[in-house]
C-alpha cells in the first residue's frame, strides 16, 4: 500500500525547498514550449543527484518526461538502478509511464505538488502503487506547494489556448 508520510515543520520546509527547485525547472520547460513539469532527485544528505524537466517536444521523444529523465540520470550517476535511498520531487502527479519507472526504481520517497485529474496514477485517476502489479511499497507525500504548482500549469495551458 502506498504509505502516507507525516511531516514535522523542518521536513515540510525541506520539501518546500526542493519543490521550489522543481518549480524553477518546470518554468524553464514551459518557456521552451514544454508542459511545465520539473523533477529533482536528492539523497538523504540533501544533495541533488539528478534533475530534469519535460523535454518531449525538444527531443521528439514521448518518454522524455521530467521524472523518467531524472530517474535515468540518477541511475547513471549512481551506477545503480535501485534508488531506495533517494527522494523524487515533481511538480505534477506522475502519469502511468512515470509511475511505472518510479516503482521499478524502488524509489524511497515520492513528493509531488499537485494532483493530475487527467492522467495521475499515484492516487487521482488510478492508484498504481497499491495495485497487485506493484512490487514496491512507495512512500508518497502530495500537496507540497500545491497552489503554485497548479497555478503554473494553469497559466501555461491558458497561454497555449490563447495562442491557438
Q: Which residues fall in each region the model found?
A:
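Immediate flanking context of iron-sulfur cluster ligation sites
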Residues: 80-92
Amino acid at each position: 500500500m502506498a504509505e502516507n508520510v507525516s511531516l514535522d515543520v523542518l521536513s515540510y520546509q525541506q520539501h518546500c525547498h526542493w519543490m521550489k527547485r522543481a518549480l524553477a525547472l518546470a518554468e524553464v520547460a514551459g518557456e521552451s514550449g514544454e508542459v511545465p513539469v520539473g523533477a529533482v532527485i536528492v539523497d538523504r544528505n540533501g544533495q541533488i543527484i539528478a534533475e530534469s524537466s519535460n523535454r518531449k517536444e525538444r527531443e521528439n521523444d514521448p518518454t522524455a518526461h521530467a521524472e523518467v529523465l531524472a530517474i535515468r540520470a540518477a541511475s547513471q550517476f549512481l551506477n545503480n538502478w535501485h534508488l531506495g535511498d533517494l527522494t523524487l520531487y515533481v511538480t505534477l502527479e506522475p502519469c502511468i509511464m512515470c509511475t511505472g519507472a518510479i516503482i521499478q526504481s524502488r524509489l524511497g520517497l515520492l513528493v509531488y505538488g499537485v494532483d493530475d485529474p487527467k492522467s495521475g496514477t499515484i492516487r487521482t485517476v488510478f492508484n498504481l502503487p497499491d495495485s497487485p502489479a506493484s512490487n514496491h511499497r512507495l512512500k508518497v507525500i502530495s500537496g507540497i506547494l500545491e497552489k503554485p504548482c497548479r497555478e503554473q500549469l494553469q497559466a501555461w495551458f491558458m497561454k497555449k489556448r490563447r495562442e491557438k
